[in-house]
Each structure stands twice: as structure tokens, then as C-alpha cells.
Amino acid sequence: ALDTGASKCIVKDLREEFVRDYCFKALSAGAIYEDNYLLGTALARPLLAYHQTQVALEEGADALSHGATGKGNDQVRFEVTYGAFAPHLQVIAPWREWDIRSREDALDYADKHKVPVESSKRDLYSRDGNLWHLSHEGDVLENVWNAPVKEMFKLTTDPMDAPDEPETIVLAFEQGTPVALDGKRLGPVEMVETLNRVAGAHGVGRLDLVENRLVGIKSRGVYETPAGTVLHLAHRELERLVLDRDTLHFKQSISVRYAQLVYDGLWFSTLREALAAFVDETEKEVTGEVRIRLYKGTADPTGRRSESSLYREDLATFGEGMAYDHADAGGFIRLYGLPERVRAMTRDEVTVDVKAVEITKPVGRPGGETK
């Protein structure tokens, strides 16, 4: 930054805050956009934008700037957060204001002004990487029929080249937050880095999808999220074990709305914070362990246990057991199905009355004739 003309450069290590307060919060909420996207980019933007505003206020700056394009979601995520914490500052968005219309234009500008960048015209993918994921967009992926090329991936092994032997891991959670791997307690950053390495080696965490952007267009992205994929799977399995049916089902609806708020750049909204309070309540008993097998691009749960488990073998068994009396089911079914039985009886009574009318009451024909 200093070499390219900046008068001052401030660097902050936000990794711990990012994983602990953003990724793991979204994990506890079960936030997955459109059933697939684990929100790696969407989670990072409010954190970056918030700290931008704090530095700008501390330094007495009169403007904020970002490098997001005019077609994407990131411009919204940055600027909504700017507005939440520094609404008086001017926003400079070069992609919208300068004569830059493509990645080639941006690369030409960088080359002309001696700005070092990793991309080149031989590799025009638009990538966004952080601890939680690595995304790939653009280039050959803009044709949704084109398959991703093998060389594009950075975090995950091709499942065809992954080890021929599966690897089993055990993840431990405390109140919905991952705290240990294979019996070893890990901090948030170390947890994600380790799982990225372990799961990525088995080709776990690849995702190719077409998503609906906030700005109204569809886009295609290929994502690598090894740690996030495994953690979401394990967390979901543990919740199924410890949450009652009504709470679990209602939380699933909350998860969808939570994910949309994050995707749309509304991390600091009142609604997102209110939903987070609900999530915190549901997670109080989500403590336990989940065993997962990693093998050639797949992650499968093979065991789960918790002191808060609502699963009872003596109730679920198909063998002999005295805890559940099968005869009790008959009364439950009659009461549970009573509304349907009443509706059927009411329907039958109406049908009889209608038939009686058809038989006894003459029906007029044109010309006054009756039958």
C-alpha cells in the first residue's frame, strides 16, 4: 500500500474475531443461503467494513472506499455497514465511478500504476479467500455448462485423487460452538485451519452452484469450504439429537431468514441480532460429540452422543422394551386424526343432503319443462 502511494497503512489481525464472532455464530444459527452456500464472503464483509469505519473515525478521514463491482453483493454489504457506523462519510466506489468495466480493465490499470496483484489475464478468475472459504467466479465459470477445471482448486484435493482409506474424526461442541477435535481442545482459528487441512485432503467441501444475488441477477460460483462443511454437518447432527421436534423445526425456518440477512449485508440489523438471541437460547443444550467419516469428497456422520440427548434407546428399540406401550398409540392416533375424521363425517353429511335435493326438487329446463 505504501509503495503505491498510501500515506499510512494500518493492518489488523481479525482472524480470531472473524471465526469466533461471525463464522461460529452463523454455524450455531445453521445459516446456509439457498440450501448450499455457507456464506464465506458474506460473513467477512461486515467485519471488514466495521473496522474500516473505526479506523476512518480514529484517523479523521473524510471518505471510505471499497473495490467491489457494481454488479455484485459486496458493494451493498460494505456500504450498508458504512452507513450503520459512519453515515456522514463519503463512499468512493471506483468500479462504479471510474472507467473500469471488466477485470481486464482493472488489470490494465494496476499494471499502468505499478500496483502488484495476484491475478493475470491468463487467470481471470475472481477469487475471494479467507479462513472460512475460497470462492471462484468468472472466466470459464460464466458459462454454467462448463465444468470447473482441476487446476482451479486451491484448498481441496480432487476427490478422485484423495486417499483410498477413509479418515474418522470426532468433533466436540459446547453450547453449539466447536471446541475440540479428536479430544484436543482448539481455539477457533486453529480449529478451522486444522479442519481445512484434514477435510480438504479428502476432497470435502467443494460446491458448484448458481445463486440469486441481492441485486437481481443470477451468478455462478464454485466454493471450497472444507472446515465449514464438516462443522455444519456435525452441528446439525448434534441438534437433531438434543433439540425437541418443535424447537428444531422452528429453528430451521429461522436459519433460512438468518442466512438471507447475512447474505444481504444486514449483519448489524435489529432483526439479525434478535434472531441471534433466539439461537443462543436453542444452543444452551447443544453440547456433545459427533463422529464423522471423511472419504473421497464425502463427509458422513457415524455417531453422536450428548448428556443432553433426547434419544432413548429403550423408547426407540424394535426389540423388547417396557418403556413404550404400543397400545397407547391407538388412542393418540384417534385424537391426532380427529380433525380429519370430523371433516370426513361433515363431508358425507353434506353429500347426502345434496343428493336428497337432487331427487326431490324438480330442476327447471329451458321453456319451463321439468324432469
Where are these regions (language model features)?
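Nucleotide-activated chemistry modules centered on ATP-dependent adenylation/adenylyltransferase
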Residues: 1-371
